[in-house]
């Protein structure tokens, strides 16, 4: 078996950043995270096997990278046992597509050898599933990990992709060439270090979750302009919008511009099934209050008609709490209109 271990001195998020985001998702959490990625000889959990595990955890207050690579298929069980023991010191497992592939695959291999699952009682944070809502906002061509890395400006991958690594690993088994082994290990290293880099993209989700403070509000006669401060720095600037609104962000600041109609704004609401739309008044009313309205004058609200009107008054422009409440209701709808 090939075993590697080394400290990570740069290119990985600091402890406080990881603690902030993992704590945001999991309240009962002791801050013992581990990032991991696996390499297998195929997708089938029954006919292929695990040959490499890479992980990053905290040791002596330092991010440390670990790898275990099988030099033959008989070493799979040994790697599984070592990884299981390794995971005992961690309670939050961070992966990319781990809940759909890595973890189910590993659980099947543990079962094959009659070994208990090391995932019992562990918290899982799958960055693929968690970051998926950002695809449209950040104009990502796909949700593959290298696509996210490229958005962040990381274009220095030098090793082969996962599919090509399978053939490289098979070549290594035949030739015992450690140059080939290093290529396989290098690909896994890039994948695991990439997890740390795209982890910071969780900051964009603060926009969706209303985790910001309004720092500026202005109405120029046609548009409402709001500026927001996030609790973290964005790893890369972005901009997006359509005919209704425009959103741009850099570092901790996000700027929001939305068109008004006659100095009024549409405030959208979730759960349109709970509202009636009144076409003559161009607004909605809760069903609990609208049951007495003639059916000729009401319709079932849709996500596009589930709104009331908001006046850009001086009182509104001088009240950050009202502005945030407006955004909390309206921004999720507007983000959903992006294509």
Where are these regions (language model features)?
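DEDD superfamily 3′-5′ metal-dependent exonuclease/proofreading module
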Residues: 1-36, 41-48, 58-339
């Amino acid at each position: 078996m090939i075993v590697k271990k080394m400290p990570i001195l740069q290119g990985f998020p600091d402890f406080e950043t990881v603690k902030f985001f993992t704590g945001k998702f999991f309240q009962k959490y002791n801050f013992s995270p581990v990032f991991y990625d696996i390499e297998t000889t195929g997708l089938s959990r029954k006919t292929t096997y695990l040959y490499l595990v890479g992980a990053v955890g905290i040791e002596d207050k330092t991010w440390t990278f670990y790898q275990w690579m099988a030099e033959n298929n008989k070493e799979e069980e040994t790697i599984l046992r070592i990884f299981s023991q390794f995971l005992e010191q961690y309670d939050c497992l961070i992966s990319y597509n781990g809940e759909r592939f890595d973890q189910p695959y590993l659980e099947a291999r543990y079962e094959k050898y009659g070994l208990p699952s090391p995932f019992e009682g562990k918290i899982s944070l799958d960055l693929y599933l968690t970051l998926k809502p950002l695809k449209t906002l950040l104009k990502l061509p796909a949700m593959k990990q290298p696509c996210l890395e490229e958005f962040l400006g990381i274009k220095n991958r030098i090793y082969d992709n996962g599919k090509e690594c399978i053939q490289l690993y098979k070549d290594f088994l035949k030739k015992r060439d450690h140059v080939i082994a290093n290529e396989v290990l290098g690909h896994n290293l890039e994948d695991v270090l990439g997890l740390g880099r795209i982890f910071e993209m969780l900051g964009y989700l603060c926009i969706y979750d209303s985790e910001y403070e309004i720092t500026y509000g202005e109405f120029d006669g046609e548009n409402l302009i709001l500026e927001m401060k996030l609790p973290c720095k964005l790893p890369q600037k972005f901009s997006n919008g359509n005919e209704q609104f425009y959103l741009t962000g850099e570092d901790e600041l996000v700027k929001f511009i939305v068109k008004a109609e006659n100095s009024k704004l549409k405030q959208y609401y979730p759960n349109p099934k709970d509202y009636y739309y009144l076409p003559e008044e161009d607004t909605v009313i809760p069903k609990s209050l609208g049951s007495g309205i003639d059916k000729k004058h009401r319709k079932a609200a849709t996500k596009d008609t589930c709104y009331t009107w908001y006046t850009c008054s001086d009182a509104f422009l001088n009240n950050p709490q009202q502005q945030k409440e407006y955004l909390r209701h309206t921004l999720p709808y507007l983000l959903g209109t992006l294509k």
